[in-house]
Amino acid sequence: MSESYASSLVLRFVLTFRASRVWSGSQAETPSLFGHGKVCAPVNAAPHRVVVVGSGFGGLFATKALRRSDVEVTLVARTAHHLFQPLLYQVATGILSEGEIAPSTRIVLRDQRNANVLIGDVTDIDPDTRTVTSVHRGRVTVTPYDSVIVAAGAGQSYFGNDRFAEFAPGMKTLDDALELRGRIMNAFDAAELATDPAERARLLTFVVVGAGPTGVEMAGQIAELSKRTLAGTFRTIDPRDARIVLLDAAPKVLPPFADSLGEHARRRLESLGVEVTLNAAVTDVDTDGLVVRAADGTEHRIEAATKVWSAGVSASPLGAMLASKSDAEIDRAGRVLVNPDLTVPGLPNVFVVGDMMALDGLPGVAQVAIQGGRYAARVIADEVKAAAEGRPVPERRPFRYRDKGSMATVSRFSAVAQVGPVKITGFLAWLMWLVVHVAYVVGFKSRLTTVCNWAWTFLGRTRTQLTVTHQQTEARLALGRLVSLEDARAARETPVRPEQLAG
């Protein structure tokens, strides 16, 4: 090695060492972005890490609202799609395909360079280590965060009778909708083959439990499917003879709406041949039917092959987990009682939005999730920007929900809508429902095909998505049995400790 080359190496080392001493001595300590006072971040500080749990309305809209912020967003969800849940009943009744209401989350966020999508079921959120743990097919992923937005949604509630789920699927996932489509169409096919009148009547009886918006829409579409689309397609049976029953323990249809709107929906359903039974609680469900208890305590049985459960919701178990690690409480539905800024009490960098949050009696509807997700994203973006510019962290304003009204379809050309004190029924409400819902369908192609399918279904009698497979109908129960077998095998292979034998 030449002397000049060795000297240059020594000089370079000295200069580098002095520069590092100057940098480390002048760098100010960076407190949390969610503290008070002025924040001075180093020029080359790592971007703020935001983890979003859930790809529903709250999670997706929160992620998209951060697209122009200097943050790194990781969206963790158990599915690879964004689900437009209010239109699930149209997948179940053959109006829309699953792709039209459930686009790929990765494709939706493809052009958002600061967003990454991870598939996994979130099992833990640790405020101490600031990590989110998720599991996908046995692979455990731990994702660090500076802020987290929890929008894991809610599942179906059977009010402590989870065994009902085997016989009466809910309406919360694509799998639910596809299974219900299979059960509905298979019931008509089986009725065509039945020779016993009682068995045929059972196969042609459809019971929807829950007279909220989902139940009303589902009952109305099963009625129209049987009376319009399937009329004349069978030779032994007449699908128009199908019996559709709508049950609810409440005293009115559409409890969240004004009484006059609920009464309008009830009359319209009855004009379609739907039997509406109120003040009726379901006490038992099995393969062949269900038992109903009336308000006077008497019980009667309805023989029905196809049952749909839309009577209640229960928040994600992540709500109870967060409450156990903070000062938060949960309500009877498992929702977290959040602060006015949608954070978990004691955890100012953990936001909870959508169906998982409980605040001021807000309903579990899409608009609450969308506005909550955008609000949480805006708070994070404002505080990150203030920290980057060395300004005081802005005071958080409380979340304010802007009620844009509630809508529910009853049948084609008929819906109910309530916007503040204004109540609208019939064809005008139905047009409003169409416009609002197509606006929130993600992607131009999906909007276009949705409108086309609506035109074919509502103006004509065609439903283009009535194809069913054996897998759609049987997969959920088969997987459930497989899990039970795996659990039983694991229990057999678990060694017994001496103290257990002694006990």
Where are these regions (language model features)?
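Low-acidity, Ser/Thr- and Arg-rich intrinsically disordered low-complexity segments
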Residues: 2-8, 12, 18-26
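Short glycine-rich anion-binding loops that position phosphate/pyrophosphate groups of nucleotides
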Residues: 153-156, 219, 313-315
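Beta1-alpha1 glycine-rich phosphate/pyrophosphate-binding loop at the start
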Residues: 40-119, 123-124, 206, 213-257, ...
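Rossmann-like dinucleotide-binding core of oxidoreductases
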Residues: 200-257, 261-264, 275-277, 364-398, ...
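C-terminal, flexible cofactor-proximal segment of oxidoreductases
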Residues: 47, 378-503
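FAD-binding core/adjacent interface of flavoenzyme oxidoreductases
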Residues: 33-47, 115-207, 296-297, 308
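A Rossmann-like FAD-binding core segment of flavoenzymes
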Residues: 113-131, 223-340, 346, 388
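FAD-site-proximal beta/loop scaffold in flavoenzymes
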Residues: 166-196, 289, 300-372
